[in-house]
């Protein structure tokens, strides 16, 4: 109770534009003798909280404007105070460029995608013939379009994204390769140890990670963050596949497409940005 009051009082002083040294020295009675380090931490957490609240408001407004806000989704958004989780919840409603899945939906293939995703004993190859039209000229085109819709659903699955993030946090590898046309430049030589380098991201010290990123930024190396592809597929399979059925092979193809085209680039970039932020803080 007392700690909560002290934090509340400190936040109020910060909102009144009092500086951290001033609060620490002259408002000890109000803050319960908090020192500068503690006040700085409160200020940092308060800023993070404000960012989350603003983002939450913007997300709710956007989804409401699309008439897509269900009571269940509203509750999930209201209860979340994790920025990444909020972005995952918003992903299906985010305005984006026209995707392959959008084209497939326009061509009437969403019902076929739902049948395949249900993974029951339907003869999907036969059912695909019922979705032919001017744009979808054969069975394989219908199945391909349905798989593209499924790939987007998998990409937007909050549980898939969470589990892949965990995999990358634990097991991601950094790989660097020299850009051959730049290899012999004088300025490239200070980065020569990264011309062909690979190590677990968790083992890379901050100074090395930042040096690699500088080398990439200056165009001397290509930098990749990767996780074992089979482990990534296993993560998705466990959350998406429902055992063997005539649809299984189509869902597996959609999983592979979703991971390579959509999930892997996004999760790898997130993992790298997080690692860079930590490295910057430690440098």
Where in the sequence are the language-model features?
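Short coil/loop linkers at secondary-structure junctions
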Residues: 2-3, 30, 69, 110
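Short hydrophobic/aromatic-rich motifs at helix boundaries and adjacent loops
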Residues: 28-32, 45-46, 72-73
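N-terminal acidic-hydrophobic amphipathic loop/helix motif that frequently occurs adjacent to catalytic
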Residues: 1-10, 45-52
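N-terminal cofactor/phosphate-binding cores enriched in small/glycine residues
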Residues: 3-26, 30-37
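Duplex nucleic acid-engaging cores and interfaces of nucleic-acid transaction enzymes
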Residues: 22, 38-41, 48, 52-283
